[in-house]
From Swiss-Prot:
Annotated GO MF terms: 4 iron, 4 sulfur cluster binding; ATP binding; metal ion binding; oxidoreductase activity, acting on iron-sulfur proteins as donors; oxidoreductase activity, acting on the CH-CH group of donors, iron-sulfur protein as acceptor
Amino-acid positions noted as binding substrate in the UniProt annotation, renumbered to this chain: G428, L429
Cofactor info, note text: Binds 1 [4Fe-4S] cluster per heterodimer. The cluster is bound at the heterodimer interface by residues from both subunits.
UniProt keyword terms in alphabetical order: 4Fe-4S, ATP-binding, Bacteriochlorophyll biosynthesis, Chlorophyll biosynthesis, Iron, Iron-sulfur, Metal-binding, Nucleotide-binding, Oxidoreductase, Photosynthesis
Pathway(s) per entry: Porphyrin-containing compound metabolism; bacteriochlorophyll biosynthesis (light-independent)
Residues noted as binding [4Fe-4S] cluster in the record, renumbered to the chain: D36
Listed name of the protein: Light-independent protochlorophyllide reductase subunit B
Top EC class for this record: oxidoreductase
Superkingdom per UniProt: Bacteria
Names of required cofactors: [4Fe-4S] cluster
Entry annotation: catalytic residues: D292 (proton donor)
UniProt record similarity statement: Belongs to the ChlB/BchB/BchZ family.
EC number, UniProt record: 1.3.7.7
Organism: Chlorobaculum parvum (strain DSM 263 / NCIMB 8327)
Amino acid sequence: MRLAFWLYEGTALHGVSRVTNSMKGVHTVYHAPQGDDYITATYTMLERTPEFPKLSISVVRGQDLARGTSRLPGTVEQVAKHYNPELIVVAPSCSTALLQEDLGQMARASGIDENKIMVYAVNPFRVAETEAAEGLFTELVKRFAAEQPKTEKPSVNLLGFTSLGFHLRSNLTSLRRMLKTLGIEVNVVAPWGAGIDDLKKLPAAWVNIAPFRELGCQAAGYLKENFGMPSITEAPLGVNATLRWLRAIIAEVNKIGAEKGMAPIEMPEMRDFSLDGQSAPSGVPWFARTADMESFSNKRAFVFGDATQVVGVTKFLKDELGMKIIGAGTYLPKQADWVREQLEGYLPGELMVTDKFQEVSAFIEEEMPELVCGTQMERHSCRKLDVPCMVISTPTHIENHLLGYYPFFGFDGADVMADRVYTSAKLGLEKHLIDFFGDAGLEYEEEEPEVFTEPAMSGNGTVTSSAEAPAEAAVATATATGELSWTAEAEKMLGKVPFFVRKKVRKNTDNYAREIGEQVITADVFRKAKEHLGG
């Protein structure tokens, strides 16, 4: 039944495809029923690349099951002839995992060289998207990484960048720019854009950079254990984190450089990291102290998403923009302990760990923060609640797969995040001002024609004025149903409350009315509630 609702994580099949679709010369064959070919539509809809997804389905039909036959060997053979990939990854879907078939034996029956086939028989009932992707990438690194002489010049590997990653290409560009400024070359980016030969030469780099807690850290750990390669796992989200990231890279590279007798790398001038090469690399340090951004000081923010983004964005909002964090959470339970450790001292209460968007939405409705940083799910929830929201984590929609340069990593990314915070919350304030003061003559609405209303006749035969009738009708309705009702005048007064706290004010007023025994909230009751609640 969960599939009838939004899910934060996709299936294991989705995680496998994110890795293989990122690579060159790698094709995936899914042993699955026809319906599981939805995965190709996901990439053609969201991924802004000219290539078609490198995925094929070995269709399992009910007739095949009855006969005890399998199409898998024939499908693998067809893929090998048509696409000629260097590697074919065979994986089961949730449906075919129930059959408990030996995929390795069936794949070998295709007659294709075993060295060109990799069976990744992950259990899709126990493993979801993130864990499946991390597991497959680690297995690929274990299989193909080979001892290599180190590159002559300082170099790094960038691990964990995958298809459908959050602002993938922009983040890569930002990291490449900073590394180039340091004079450090990129040996391999994997899995994004990597082929089998690239995986083989991973050990040639001096340092591994794995900024994503969800993907790449296990592979970096394997390379460290087996090839002695140091790794840097912090994500450069924000100015402070980027400076730490740069210093960590310089320190690790200089250790290896000293063994080779090379001159140490020095931290360049900060302006060298800027887009124009003349100004500060980020405007956040001074912008955060302007009158505009000072108004954000102590504004309440809630952050939800994957582990990497939640930790980085939470620290950025509090440490660099001065916002008040009222809560944070993640949909990845296996990363929860790491997130708690990283955010110790940042949260007023417990970390929210859930994969149910309804629980996150309920928290937002209860707290009504001034800003929510979340996923596409939170964007939908916040639209219903009239709460400003910016997307900072997968899952995302087309709005976060842009052709332009919008990184979240590095100095450039700090500027993008600050802009998103500012515009998300400020545009919300603009909406409130328009609600409060009107459209200032920008639009002219036609006046509604006057409608003559006959005086209402009460039960005892007396005439009631038209102004009194609605209030009496509201009382009658409320008495009959036992529910609270609001008069038109009270609703009008509520409309002058800023939209981002309006629901909370309505709820508090309802509670006050129940306490004093009122069933109809009039303008007078609304004013009393406001005084009682300290507003």
